[in-house]
Regions:
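Structural recognition of the beta-strand scaffold that forms the well-ordered cores
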Residues: 62-65, 97-103, 132-135, 143-145, ...
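Alpha-helical support elements that line or immediately flank enzyme active sites
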Residues: 64-80
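Second-shell loop/turn segments in exported
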Residues: 49-61, 117-124, 171, 245-252, ...
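Bacterial N-terminal signal peptides that target proteins for export
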Residues: 1-9
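Active-site signature of cysteine proteases
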Residues: 31, 180-386
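Papain-like cysteine protease catalytic cores
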Residues: 91-200
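Bacterial N-terminal signal peptides
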Residues: 9-20
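N-terminal regions that are enriched for targeting/export leaders
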Residues: 26-49
Length: 386
């Protein structure tokens, strides 16, 4: 069963509310919100031992690509000494194209939409980390310099939707025709994806660049979650709208193991890309750069497997945003996670956010990490299958 969409009930009172009163109330709410965040003792540093690339500013609903491409960049920096040496010599940062991945995501979404004849199909901006690794495995990746950044995301979306609307009206769901028309729109707003690129004087395909030059193994990574509708130490689907092709390969852990695993991974120097909720009272991503569980959200409940499950089922936890975790610190016995966001350096804490352990336990739906970061005993629980 799909969990319900979060909604806001608005109660209308039979009183006259003046603009001045509204302004005063708004100011009070802002002051209370600021006071709440001022009292949160988040770490005041932004340093980390996990190498990662500079903060970017996404356009449109492509956080899933920005975060997971940043994750792959960080993985290259962690594992590929030759690429790191070449970057240092050239005084450059590794900069892979998020929109190359977005291009192929829309192609595959259109293909799936046509196969389902528009029924129970999703053609939205959203996506998840496994979309990126699957697409990089299938189509490779290219440097940012070799593929355009979209100039008007809204206009592109309008034109893409118009293609599907025309096919809905005609009833013609010929897959090749739908994909060809979608690609024409993408070629116009972005660019035709290159068949070859030149890197360090070598001509190579995007797949060769990904798997040989960067030495990425996109299929190696695990997505881990913690919900009770799938047996623990089994694999299943994360039932959220952005899982548009119903991927069912998530590894499901009990909450204690789920938390221990991400802590262990970050402490050992592995980057982790996380799928998180966005809009609680205790979160100020672009302002204070803090995300914690506000006491009002708990209503006296403990933070445990049952409350995590309940908030997911009842729609209080939704998959709103994907970001990259690049550090874990324990301050006065409290877990904190340093997050590289994709809203530019003017948001949050110079583009970073500190997530507290309670938020990680309650509002982070899943994360992707290299299985080498896992305790071998956990891998054994899954039959040793990496």
């Amino acid at each position: 069963m799909r969990h319900p969409v979060r909604f806001l009930a608005v109660l209308m009172a039979a009183v006259l509310v003046t603009p001045a009163l509204l302004t005063a109330q708004s100011a009070t709410e802002v002051d209370e919100r600021q006071a709440f965040f001022d009292e949160i003792q988040a770490p005041n540093w932004l340093g980390t031992d996990i190498d990662h690339t500079p903060i970017k500013r996404q356009r449109g609903g492509s956080c899933w690509s920005f975060s997971t491409v940043a994750f792959l960049e960080s993985e290259v920096l962690r594992t590929n000494e030759d690429v790191v040496a070449a970057l240092k010599e050239a005084r450059e940062d590794l900069d892979l194209s998020e929109y190359y991945v977005v291009y192929w995501a829309y192609v595959e979404k259109a293909r799936e939409y046509a196969r389902r004849k528009g029924e129970n199909a999703r053609f939205t901006d959203g996506g998840l980390s496994h979309d990126v690794t699957w697409l990089v495995e299938k189509y490779g990746i290219v440097p940012e310099a070799d593929f355009a950044v979209v100039e008007d995301y809204s206009a592109m979306r309008t034109d893409l939707n118009a293609v599907l609307k025309a096919h809905e009206e005609s009833g013609d769901w010929t897959e090749d025709a739908v994909v060809a028309e979608i690609r024409e729109v993408l070629d116009r707003h972005l660019a035709p994806p290159p068949e070859t690129i030149t890197v360090a004087g070598q001509v190579m395909t995007p797949i060769e660049y990904a798997t040989e030059y960067l030495a990425l193994d996109p299929a190696a990574y695990w997505e881990i979650t913690s919900y009770t509708d799938v047996p623990f130490y089994g694999r299943g689907e994360l039932d959220v709208p952005d899982n548009w092709w119903d991927y069912d390969g998530y590894y499901n852990l009990p909450l204690d193991d789920y938390m221990q695993t991400i802590n262990q991974a970050l402490d050992a120097g592995y980057p982790v890309v996380i799928d998180t909720d966005w809009g609680d009272k205790g979160a100020s991503w672009n302002g204070a750069g803090i995300a914690v569980i506000h006491p009002d959200q708990l209503d006296g409940a403990a933070i445990d497997q049952a409350s995590r499950q309940l908030d997911f089922v009842e729609g209080r936890t939704t998959d709103d945003h994907l970001v990259l975790a690049v550090d874990h610190r324990v301050v006065d016995g409290v877990d904190w996670y340093l997050i590289k966001n994709s809203h530019g350096t003017s948001s949050g804490r110079r583009g970073y956010v500190w997530i507290r352990g309670d938020w990680m336990a309650m509002r982070v739906l899943a994360y992707m990490v290299h299985p080498d970061a896992l305790d071998p005993s956990l891998v054994d629980q899954f039959g040793g299958n990496r």
